[in-house]
């Protein structure tokens, strides 16, 4: 199950989980042998990053299986404050080649979620040039953004809604 807490998720207008709901959802999922992956895929600014350690500790304490991050700072904090959670790299990080996938793996990522814009052949090349232990995830559908994943400026320009803050107007 993929879900988000009330902070740091890219779905600003979704009914995300408060800490108590998240803990209950994780317990329910685990009772049914289902893993829970929590998104932390915004790019936190300085005034937001200070809240991230407490959020990560709550996720760790709730038993979340993996956190999905896009930002290197969030990735680093997840290793420190959510040591029981696997770290997955969001499509928002725009991983579009095997060198980048391997770099994230070397830093401790167990899964990379590739940029949505890749062809099947490009995905195959990444798989063939990364360790078998590194899980690869790829979207087969998705946003129609005029950009690479995680680098959208058009939404903000056209509507004043910042896609990199979870408010994409797509």
Where are these regions (language model features)?
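Active-site pocket-lining/capping segments in soluble small-molecule metabolic enzymes
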Residues: 1-95, 99, 113-117, 121-170
């Amino acid at each position: 199950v993929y879900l988000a807490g009330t902070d740091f998720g890219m779905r600003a207008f979704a009914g995300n989980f408060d800490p108590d709901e998240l803990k209950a959802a994780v317990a329910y999922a685990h009772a049914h042998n289902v893993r829970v992956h929590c998104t932390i895929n915004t790019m936190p600014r300085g005034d937001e990053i200070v809240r991230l350690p407490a959020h990560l500790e709550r996720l760790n304490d709730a038993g979340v299986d993996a956190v999905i991050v896009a930002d290197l700072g969030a990735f680093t904090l997840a290793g420190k404050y959510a040591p029981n959670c696997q770290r997955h790299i969001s499509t928002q990080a725009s991983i579009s080649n095997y060198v980048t996938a391997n770099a994230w793996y070397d830093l401790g990522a167990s899964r990379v979620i590739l940029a949505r814009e890749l062809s099947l052949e490009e995905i195959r090349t990444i798989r063939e040039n990364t360790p078998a232990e590194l899980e690869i995830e790829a979207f087969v559908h998705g946003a129609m953004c005029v950009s690479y994943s995680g680098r959208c400026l058009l939404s903000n320009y056209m509507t004043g809604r910042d896609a990199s803050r979870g408010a994409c107007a797509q």
